[in-house]
Amino acid sequence: MPTIRVKENEPFEVALRRFKRAVEKTGLLTELRAREFYEKPTTERKRKHAAAVKRHYKRIRSQMLPPKLY
């Protein structure tokens, strides 16, 4: 669990923003959402494979861009 120390005369909004940034950096919320419901191993593999395929096609698309004609 990320913790922050609130400095003297520090506004609450600034401390809250620092805390949110620390939580996001640790990946706590994404892990919590992933573990909220049980996911069968086959479903997890299928989802990860689909994400990998999507990343692959996205990478290929970005490499095959035509040259810009100004």
Swiss-Prot record:
Name of the encoding gene: rpsU
Keyword Ribonucleoprotein: yes
Originating species: Chromobacterium violaceum (strain ATCC 12472 / DSM 30191 / JCM 1249 / CCUG 213 / NBRC 12614 / NCIMB 9131 / NCTC 9757 / MK)
Domain of life of the organism encoding this protein: Bacteria
NCBIfam families noted in UniProt: S21p
Protein name, entry field: Small ribosomal subunit protein bS21
InterPro entries recorded: Ribosomal_bS21 (IPR001911), Ribosomal_bS21_CS (IPR018278), Ribosomal_bS21_sf (IPR038380)
HAMAP family the UniProt entry points to: Ribosomal_bS21 (MF_00358)
Family (UniProt): Belongs to the bacterial ribosomal protein bS21 family.
Alphabetical list of Pfam families matching this protein: Ribosomal_S21 (PF01165)
Entry's Gene Ontology cellular component terms: ribonucleoprotein complex; ribosome
GO molecular function: structural constituent of ribosome
Keywords: Ribonucleoprotein, Ribosomal protein
Gene Ontology biological process terms from the UniProt entry: translation
